[in-house]
């Protein structure tokens, strides 16, 4: 069985890695199974640093579609055309997609229209806000998937309430835990920990990555002020992308502990 595994961004690889290792093990055990990793971005994507794939013990993507951009419709159209060509050149029986990105939806649609089986990892997640582009993506992908792999029972309930075929739903748990367990021996205190005046159990970790939140200054400002108030004297460590840093700084808030 040939499987095409799609990744639309760096975080997807954290969830793909355990699957790749499992398929490798099955193949070594004599199973007739293989996979091809397709990244919808560019080969020179700066977010895919050299250590990423070695850290995850997985091979680099077999193909790069080279699609990027901010306009959802243009990106979706470009990915669909490129992925169509990819499947023409490298046929598969199953297309496995992850999460709820535009790439996830685009590749799932292409696969379904070609009569292929679609597997969705992290299925059933819902915000119940259709103004969020990702909510649109995940709802569409779940509706056309043949294998719905969920991380929790709430996701199962969401899919059942939407009328999904029960036999399609598979509760497998949070696959990120597999990645954490695989790398737990490497989880050591970084050298900069003490230089920032941090102590174990005495700091908060913050990450922000939703564009729709970052673009709503009033909401973002309220969130940051609430966080600062609740944190008190506790330092807040925020490993964020540069555009997130700019969005926070543009608020002009006094947050010396951030």
Q: Which residues are covered by each model-predicted region?
A:
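Residues at the starts of beta-strands that form the adenosine-phosphate
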Residues: 2, 32-36, 117, 168, ...
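Structural beta-sheet core signal
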Residues: 5, 37-39, 120, 171, ...
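Cofactor-binding loop segments of dinucleotide-utilizing enzymes, especially the Rossmann-like FAD-
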Residues: 8, 39-42, 123, 174, ...
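A short, Lys/Arg-enriched amphipathic alpha-helix followed by its capping loop at the start of a domain
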Residues: 19-33, 226-233
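Conserved nucleotide-sugar phosphate-binding/catalytic loop shared by glycosyltransferases and other
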Residues: 31-75
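Active-site and donor-binding regions of nucleotide-sugar-utilizing enzymes
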Residues: 4-7, 12-24, 28, 52, ...
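A nucleotide-sugar donor-handling region in carbohydrate enzymes
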Residues: 42-47, 66, 144-217
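Donor-nucleotide binding loops and adjacent catalytic segments primarily
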Residues: 50-52, 188-258
């Amino acid at each position: 069985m040939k499987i095409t595994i799609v990744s639309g961004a760096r975080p997807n690889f954290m969830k793909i890695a355990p699957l790749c290792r499992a398929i490798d093990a099955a193949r070594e055990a004599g199973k007739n199974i293989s996979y091809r990793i397709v990244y919808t971005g560019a080969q020179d994507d700066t977010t895919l640093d050299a250590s990423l794939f070695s850290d995850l013990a997985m091979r680099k993507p077999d193909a790069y579609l080279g699609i990027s951009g901010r306009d959802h419709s243009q990106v979706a159209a470009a990915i669909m055309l490129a992925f169509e060509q990819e499947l023409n050149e490298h046929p598969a029986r199953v297309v496995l997609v992850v999460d709820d990105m535009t790439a996830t939806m685009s590749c799932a649609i292409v696969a379904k229209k070609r009569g292929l089986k679609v597997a969705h990892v992290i299925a059933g997640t819902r915000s119940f806000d259709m103004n969020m582009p990702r909510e649109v993506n995940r709802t569409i992908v779940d509706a056309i998937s043949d294998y719905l792999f969920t991380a929790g029972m709430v996701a199962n309930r969401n899919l059942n309430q939407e009328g999904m075929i029960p036999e399609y739903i598979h509760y497998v748990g949070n696959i990120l835990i597999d990645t954490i367990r695989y790398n737990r021996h490497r989880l050591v205190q970084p050298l900069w920990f003490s230089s920032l005046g941090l102590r174990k159990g005495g700091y908060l970790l913050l990450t922000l990555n939703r564009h729709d939140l970052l673009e709503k200054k009033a909401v973002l400002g309220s969130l940051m002020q609430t966080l600062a108030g609740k944190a008190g004297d506790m330092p807040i460590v925020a490993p964020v992308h540069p555009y997130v840093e700019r969005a926070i700084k543009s608020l002009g808030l006094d947050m010396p502990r951030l």
